[in-house]
Amino acid sequence: MSASELATSYSALILADEGIEITSDKLLSLTKAANVDVEPIWATIFAKALEGKDLKELLLNIGSAAAAPAAGGAGAPAAAAGGEAAAEEQKEEAKEEEESDEDMGFGLFD
């Protein structure tokens, strides 16, 4: 990640922490105050990507998404030993896991 991307990311986090709407103008103002040269396109991209999203909620979801595969992976040996009913339960869990992973709000151009 380049310095300009990193500075823009930090600027977005600062604005979100203060409860201020994230716009390209505000991102550019913060990066300019930090003496970091950022091309206006980066501020626009970040602002559009985060438009209408709760950045704090996105950050909270990252931790829970990372824990999900570990819990699902532990059920595989039990499914093999438990027979057909356990295998069916495993398929249901996998399907639920796939559905929950479909849209976590991380799309760049949503």
Curated annotation (Swiss-Prot):
Residues 95-104 have a biased composition (Acidic residues). It comes from Schizosaccharomyces pombe (strain 972 / ATCC 24843) (Fission yeast). Residues 69-110 are annotated as: Disordered. Yeasts contain 4 individual small ribosomal A proteins (RPA) which can be classified into two couples of similar but not identical sequences. Each couple is distinctly related to one of the two A proteins present in multicellular organisms. Rpa3 and rpa4 are essential for cell survival, whereas rpa1 and rpa2 are not. It holds the Pfam family Ribosomal_60s. GO terms for molecular function: protein kinase activator activity; ribonucleoprotein complex binding; structural constituent of ribosome. This is Large ribosomal subunit protein P1B. Keywords: Cytoplasm, Phosphoprotein, Ribonucleoprotein, Ribosomal protein. The lineage of its organism: Eukaryota, Fungi, Dikarya, Ascomycota, Taphrinomycotina. One of its GO terms (cellular component) is cytosol. The keyword Amino-acid biosynthesis does not apply. It comes from the Eukaryota. Residues 69-85 have a biased composition (Low complexity).
